[in-house]
Amino acid sequence: MAMERQMDMQWWLDSKFGLFIHWGPSSVGGVEIGWDRRSHPYDHPGRARIPDAEYDQYYTRFNPVEFDADAIVLAAKQAGMKYIVFTSKHHDGFANWHTQMSDYNIANTPFKRDICRELADAVHRHGLKLGWYYSTRDWYHPDYLVGDNSKYNDFYHGQVRELLSNFGKVDLLWFDHVAGTWADYRFRELFEMIHKLQPGILVNNRAARFVFGHKAGTPDPELAELVKGDFDTPEGKIGVFMKDRPWESCIVMSRPADGGGWSYRPEAITRSFAECAKTLSACVTGRGNLLLNAGPMSTGQLRPEEMGLLKAFGPWMQTFGEGLYETQGGPYINGEWGGATIRGNDLYLHVFEWQNGALALPALPREVLACTELGGEDVACRQDSNELSLTLSGEKNRDTHSIVKLSLADGTDIPLIPTDVASTAREQVSALEDPMGDN
């Protein structure tokens, strides 16, 4: 990674944890945002449950009078999240701001207030970083894929321009999918505009997602590199350990039995705090971030279970955050047992599975000066030339996995250390994985 880009990304690399918010008129029906709309002018059949005429009228009843941007932003901040990515527009084409490019927007609902404006102001007010999710795919717009593609480019470039011009500092742009051919889009023009309007902004890997992998022609290497963006976005799963390519897993807090759960679905079951905390550690030890998704209700509030989950993270992060923030995954490569992070001479073992209160790992090339479990009990540590062994001293009950801090003596950089066959395979696969591939 070039030094200048490394500096632009450092805040994100250090942050580890963000809040994803999917919200719009679909919450009125309690259906999946975008995907439950029947017509998809694209080759993915989707869920397709709700007739267009019904879905496209949800906005006439969208009146989230209990929406409080400050309350949501503060809940994220108190949970230890450092940035928020909000759905400005999803695949259904509805804009959560007062866009001049379309009448299908929040200004024409009973609510009328500019949700993006209120959210952006709250994020800036409380010191977090702001990201916009923007779906280039638009199943409402008459020119998307089936009409005048030049007009569609003008439309979506215009909306992106508004998002990057009218809301102050924007730190991240999170595109989501587009189909068609390379000739259908003006990607160079788009990226030039993005970086001119918001120097230093980060862009994910989905600006041209699904153009890759189709019979759409082959772009020149410079264009392919441009649209690859700054980081990958494994969806609904934990990314693999990658040495040289940043990534961020996006995962829902609440999931219905039939999948999805990005937006509010009343039947969805919220994951346990222990599962979410483990997921965060699994991402960070793999050198990734976690973007944990919430879907507000039609009232504008988060469902109580999701708000409770955010509240549970607060005290946990106060105790365990030092093993996450501003660290780098490694040197131990993730295995079934857990993974590791390191910052300077402090190495943190995120232990998901103890074997009768013990853990054995390959030896480190540095002396271990001290060993303690964060928020827990004393840990006996012994290291010889072949093995590092840890043993818990008691039978303390734990609500979540353990994070054990090792204080190391000064020494040379520690190389990556495979801990089992599976972790070695994951590292090899990560080097071959197409960062534009489908997640």
Locate each region found by the language model.
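Mature catalytic domains of secreted/periplasmic carbohydrate-active enzymes
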Residues: 1-439
